[in-house]
Amino acid sequence: MTERTLVLIKPDAVARGYVGEILSRIERKGLTIAALELRVASEEVAGSHYAEHAERPFYPSLLEFITSGPLVAAVLEGPRAIAAFRQLAGGTDPVDKALPGTIRGDFGLEAQQNLVHGSDSVESAEREIALWFPALSSI
């Protein structure tokens, strides 16, 4: 069964020149890029995307970071796309949790600026795709 997921290549990865490497890893994994856009996230979109963290102490710095510069938003498709990308990304904390060979394990330096975001469930993917790519929404 084909699944869709939202991936964000965050501003730190764009600034450090890792977009090509990350997209290459996605393609080598066998996932299809169904949509891709370079953009600067608005505070409104960023706030909606990270709404579940609104009461957390790191929320203001998270919004500041994700809106700080260009990012790449993409919709990936493929069998078990959500789990496949999350495996490719590695653990959220690049130093303590991400294994070598993963995007975060190879290039990440700290937990908040951890290069990429990938949806964590089918429900999250549907919500996030609707937010970032309304024309592709199935909601």
Curated annotation (Swiss-Prot):
Q: Which residues bind ATP?
A: 10, 58, 86, 92, 104, 114
List of catalytic residues: 117
- InterPro entries associated with the record: NDK-like_dom, NDK-like_dom_sf, Nucleoside_diP_kinase, Nucleoside_diP_kinase_AS
Pfam families for the chain: NDK
Task: Give its E.C. classification number.
Answer: 2.7.4.6
Q: What family does this belong to?
A: Belongs to the NDK family.
Oligomeric form and interacting partners: Homotetramer.
The protein, known as: Nucleoside diphosphate kinase
Per the UniProt entry, what species is this protein from, by scientific name? Rhodococcus erythropolis (strain PR4 / NBRC 100887)
Q: Cite the source lineage.
A: Bacteria, Bacillati, Actinomycetota, Actinomycetes, Mycobacteriales
Q: Which gene encodes it?
A: ndk
